[in-house]
Amino acid sequence: MADHSPIYVGLLFSVTGDISTIETSQLRGTLFAIDEVNQAGGINGREIVPIHYDPQSSPGLYRVLAERLILENKINVMFGCYMSSTRKAVIPIIERWNRLLFYPTLYEGFECSSNIVYTGAAPNQNSIQLAEFMMENYGERVYLVGSDYIYPYESNRIMTDLVRQRQRGEKVGERYVPLDATGEDFKDVIADIKDKQPHFIFSTVVGNSTQLLYRAYADAGFDPRTMPIASLTTLEAELAQMGKGVGAGHVSAAPYFQSIATPKNIDSLEKFRTRFGTDVVPNAGWEAAYFQVHMFAQAMQLSGSDAIDALMPNLLGMEFDAPQGRVRIDPSNHHTCLFPRIGIANDEGQFTIVREATRAVHPDPYLIAHSLGDWTVSLKTPK
């Protein structure tokens, strides 16, 4: 007799707190994909039923709620986390109970858990390309500003190493602000930037305080044509928070931008807006959250079980036609082959893509084999 019982999955995305904007978009991307799978008949006739908890942007709550999902809700698979501090809070729980986390966010690399599938960009899929683009087009003096937690520190270290590969590459300053930063926190940062006069600013500020940095930059009269902010974490959702025009001229790197003009992306955006409206802004985190659900569904369809030991042989090496292009989970490190892109923000709150990969770049979370100028990660100007 066929099993038609529901498949419960856990969702750990904050809808309150400092990272609520980006995680709400990831939550909606996840729910969108679950809807698509269920409307197509589910997984072997079984409906996916999400159990969502709001960790309120608190790493401690992610840990508590991950354990609740496992012990009380009996789930085997969860999707979630944006900040590295929240992912690291969850890792001991999923490893202790041998459960699976799909993590849909770029991060600093230098990690490989057998209980995680990483669908966001590794450093060789964004940092290298961004560093090369900025130094070729703006100059080799960088000022680093970030939020005060692990990802910005590690990402800034990587950017510093990349800049220093150039003979004249130089880090001229580095500052950090609280996750719940206010406008006051950026006054000293802006004053220091005025004093140091870098060629570009590399921002790893995350969450709802991102808009404050860009507004402070604009209020200071800085010009993005000569000293832009470059970022891996400022995407369409953050531009929408700032208001149109505030982020224009600044540069970001990501595998996905809404402006990708492929039939798959255009169709996905249209269906998403029809289902959920326009209050949530799709971005790279949204797209990774979306396609990882489909990859889970395909793997479970083959395995017949959501137990990690049954899923993993089918997940590793799996491919999927995502809005960014055809992605693949690398069997050697549980990370995903993605399509790096560089975008410059425009007045409409979107990104004009100025560089993009012609093929998927294999993830190298430990940056073992890559450096500036490496042909395997280089980008081309779109035709």
Regions found by a protein language model. Name each.
Residues 25-26, 43-109:
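Beta-alpha junction/loop-to-helix N-cap segments that form part of ligand/metal-binding clefts
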Residues 29-50, 167:
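Signal peptide-proximal N-terminal region
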Residues 54, 110-132, 247-256:
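Short beta-strand elements at the ligand-binding edges of bilobed clamshell
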Residues 115-219, 263:
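Extracellular/periplasmic Venus flytrap/periplasmic-binding protein
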